[in-house]
Swiss-Prot record:
The protein's Enzyme Commission number: 3.6.1.23
One annotated GO molecular function: dUTP diphosphatase activity
Catalytic reaction(s) noted: dUTP + H2O = dUMP + diphosphate + H(+)
Residue runs in coiled coils: none
UniProt KW Ligase keyword: no
Family statement: Belongs to the dUTPase family.
UniProt cross-references to CDD domains, sorted A to Z: trimeric_dUTPase (cd07557)
Cofactor(s) recorded in Swiss-Prot or TrEMBL: Mg(2+)
Function recorded in the entry: This enzyme is involved in nucleotide metabolism: it produces dUMP, the immediate precursor of thymidine nucleotides and it decreases the intracellular concentration of dUTP so that uracil cannot be incorporated into DNA.
Superkingdom, taxonomy of origin: Bacteria
GO BP: dUMP biosynthetic process; dUTP catabolic process
InterPro entries in the record: dUTPase (IPR008181), dUTPase-like (IPR029054), dUTPase-like_sf (IPR036157), dUTPase_trimeric (IPR033704)
Protein name: Deoxyuridine 5'-triphosphate nucleotidohydrolase
Amino acid sequence: MSSPEISIKLKRLDHGAGLPLPAYATAHAAGLDVVSAEDVTLAPGARHAVATGFAIAIPEGYEVQVRPRSGLALKHGVTCLNTPGTIDADYRGEVKVILANLGSEPFEVKRGERIAQLVPAAVQRAAFAEVSDLDETARGAGGFGSTGR
């Protein structure tokens, strides 16, 4: 069963001319591939907010998550920081992807190269209720590997 498709408005910026719009690579892909609108070289250990050449208007009640591409991470040590990054429904600036080179060699990002995936997701709002005590659980305060490696 698939979720209903939502419509996201996209404004192409001047430096995004000629680039493909975000698109699914396969029929069952969860993320839309997004490409770079600029050439940039990432030195080992460097990071850069890579331009995509577009801005979007996400419907209220949704966000768009920015996620890394597994091939870039495995083959080159290049990944997205702040993952998943969240693009809020009220943001109207250019979508940028924070890439980091965790590898040992410089990595060249070419204009038009796929750099990340965008995954639209419904947002569940919450309100915190301050209490004096929390209910007990078997796990308790254990975290950061307390349930295994």
